[in-house]
């Protein structure tokens, strides 16, 4: 459960903090994934693609650091 404190009726900052906390907990991604049923084989393919993307991103970062 996500708790957000409201200080002096400041709704704008409260809403901003709430959205930030939802993003940190990957809430929006989970909602998007659960919107439709994903077959186990499609899930494996997606996970492998995400892992490959992370590896390429890390390699690119490493290349620019050197």
Curated annotation (Swiss-Prot):
Alphabetized UniProt keyword annotations: Ribonucleoprotein, Ribosomal protein
Pfam families noted in UniProt: Ribosomal_S21
Molecular function GO labels: structural constituent of ribosome
UniProt key word Ribonucleoprotein: yes
GO biological process, one term: translation
InterPro entries cross-referenced by the UniProt entry: Ribosomal_bS21 (IPR001911), Ribosomal_bS21_sf (IPR038380)
Coiled-coil segments: none
Any one of the GO CC terms: ribosome
The family this protein is said to belong to: Belongs to the bacterial ribosomal protein bS21 family.
UniProt-recorded name of the protein: Small ribosomal subunit protein bS21
Organism whose genome encodes this protein: Rickettsia prowazekii (strain Madrid E)
């Amino acid at each position: 459960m996500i708790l957000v404190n409201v200080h002096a009726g400041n709704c704008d900052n409260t809403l901003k903090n709430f959205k930030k906390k939802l993003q940190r907990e990957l809430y929006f991604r989970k909602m998007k994934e659960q919107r439709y049923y994903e077959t186990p084989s499609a899930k494996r393919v997606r996970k492998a693609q995400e892992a490959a993307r992370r590896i390429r991103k890390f390699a690119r970062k490493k290349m620019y650091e050197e």
